Amino acid sequence: MLMKRGFTLVEMLVVIASIGILAALLLPALSRAKHSAQRSVCQSNVRQLNFAVHMYADDHGNELRAITNKEAIYVSYKESVLPYLGRTRGQTNDALFACPADDFDCDDPAINTLFSFWSPPPTGKCFYRQATTHFSSYAFNGEAPDSDTTRVAQKIFQSVREPSKLILEGELSGAFGLSAHDRKQPHQFPDARNVMSFVDGHVSYIKIYWNGVAGFDGCPAFYEPPAGYDYKWTEK
């Protein structure tokens, strides 16, 4: 009677090592696929929000909403577009307003201080869980933070000279030099990539210029990028 030969220790070690090598090769690819899928969802969200803002404007003489609450001018546009998205006014958490990559730690002092102009500043995880960000990962380019410089609020679409460059709305993180899709330390860094939409309706995953000044005063939304960047915050 023939006896079945089992694996030797060396053979088992070779198999285990092979599995480990395969896992090491596959994990980065799986991670890239996950991040790509998250970015695709985010781009879809931003595209739908851009379309809803256009629908709102169509019903209001092609004029973008005027917002009197300057502290919330970037996020309170959500109430205006909800009816155009089949949502009810007053809804808070909604997947359409949540970037799946948005898991920022708002308790991190480096991030918390960026929102010092909000009272109270956000705490805990994610922008889309915060009342101060109107339960959204996204923001309307209505007005510069802590400033009287109007962006697209109250603008008539036809009056915009470069609609393919003027940001309409997109990821809130972009205004502060952060990126949910390409994390680095420190949190603010040059060319942080964000999903942004424009007045002409297109959506792009773009690099946001940062001047290197850390903290709230260095937020990219305070200044225009130099040549080489295909976006702008204002029309001067």
PLM region spans:
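N-terminal single-pass transmembrane signal-anchor helix
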Residues: 2-34
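Juxtamembrane interface helices immediately C-terminal to a transmembrane segment
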Residues: 25, 34-45
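Short, well-structured segments within or immediately adjacent to enzyme catalytic domains
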Residues: 40-236
